[in-house]
Amino acid sequence: MRLGIDIGKVIINGPAHPEGGDTAFFTGDTARLLRTPSMPGAFETIARLVTLFDGRVWLVSKCGERVERRTLQWLAHHDFAGRTGIPPDHVRFCRRRPDKAIHCAELGITHFVDDTLDVHEALRGLVPHLYLFGGHQSGPEWLEHTPTWASVEEAITATFAGTPGERGR
């Protein structure tokens, strides 16, 4: 089994920036960018999921080149690799949301966490376990709504119950 995780509004909590929201991450200077907090519980939960998935965890994000550079700066500044166990070469970017499906197919992703419904629609039928992250009221019945990192961990861990031989696939 293999896990894919979006970055913006799933790991990086742009809307909670101390200086007033998402735009500080996208348009502010480097110091403002680096002050953008992570989502509550993200680093700790992801570290446990990396162990559960035996290191088979990737970040897959849609953004332009500038935001890609800023995202990599943020991840490095917050020691994301050291704190979670996800190495820098397990971070992938694409320019269009539906293109996340290309990365998921190449990597054999079986579980994916994203806050955007259209990404899940692109992954439907390709990735068996889809988790809609964040404060959405609801989503289609073919995906699981996970408003917090605690609920993500609970939902994903439940898929491992009774399948110890499946972990390496």
Residue ranges and their predicted role:
Residues M1-R2, G55-R56, T110:
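Short coil/turn segments at beta-strand junctions that form active-site/ligand-binding loops
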Residues P15-H17, C63, R97, H136:
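Short, flexible active-site-adjacent loop segments at beta-strand->alpha-helix junctions, enriched
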Residues I11-I12, E65-R66, V119:
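Short acidic, S/G/P-rich loop/turn micro-motifs used as interaction or catalytic elements
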